[in-house]
Amino acid sequence: MAEVINGILIREVETKNIMTKSSLPVGGYSVNPYVGCTHACKYCYASFMKRFTGHKEEWGTFLDVKHWPEIKNPKKYAGQRVVIGSVTDGYNPQEEQFGNTRKLLEQLIGSDADILICTKSDLVVRDIALLKKLGRVTVSWSINTLDENFKNDMDSASSIERRIAAMKLVYEAGIRTVCFVSPVFPGITDFEAIFERVKDQCDLFWLENLNLRGGFKKTIMDYIAGKHPDLVPLYDEIYNKHNRSYFEALEVKAEKMAKKYDCAFVDNEMPYGRVPQGHPVIVDYFYHEEIRGTENTGKRNR
């Protein structure tokens, strides 16, 4: 069954198991209540999923609503990292209608899993009471700019101000929060300005560089040429000549920022926990391709 709702092609599909072993550096399980994502981010790495799902539609214009057998033994995932939204956003606008993410969270009550929710939405505040029942939960918002115009050029998700407001509400409810500054656009993303806005309402401040590969490399390079022509030489140096010195300099800047604000500075996420307000752990994920297998150690393989 398929129908078009507000310009999005919606299908309802059956899946045998909603829990999938993850190949992400954070390990554990990857759980995606939907196929596709209607935020239509221009830099989205998850657009590669079309190769496996058979979708011909443009990324961001379709959404498959999954139906799965109830999770009968949630305790099976005790102590495991469960990432919700690795290749979708569980709180996309359609979640308000279909409620798949809420259903998933209800099925994980009592699991004692270490749950990480990745989103660009403020809809997550709807489920604060439910998240508190789950215990070990972290909610991460992607915020890579304070400029709403640039944000609107890149995605159709909630405004930056709405994301920041949602983060504050979730943080004040006692739930661990992350500001995921991803992707850091060279010459555009001012991560210290973002830090100033969110440092009192997040436990982790996570930095990840912009990676350009596949079909969206041309999309972003064309955007830079059209909107930021002064940055073309820098992007050519980084993404065509593979010069990493820009991000090496940003890593140094981030470490200095950590010292300035008396924050821990690590190469990867530390084990679950809250930190003193105003002193979030700053996570250097500029070298995430080197981090695989180091989850919860705080150190990169060197």
Named regions from a protein language model:
Residues 87-89, 120-122, 142-146, 182-184, ...:
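Active-site beta-loop-alpha junctions enriched in small/polar residues
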Residues 156, 168-189, 240-244:
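Conserved strand-turn element in the central/C-terminal portion of the radical SAM core barrel
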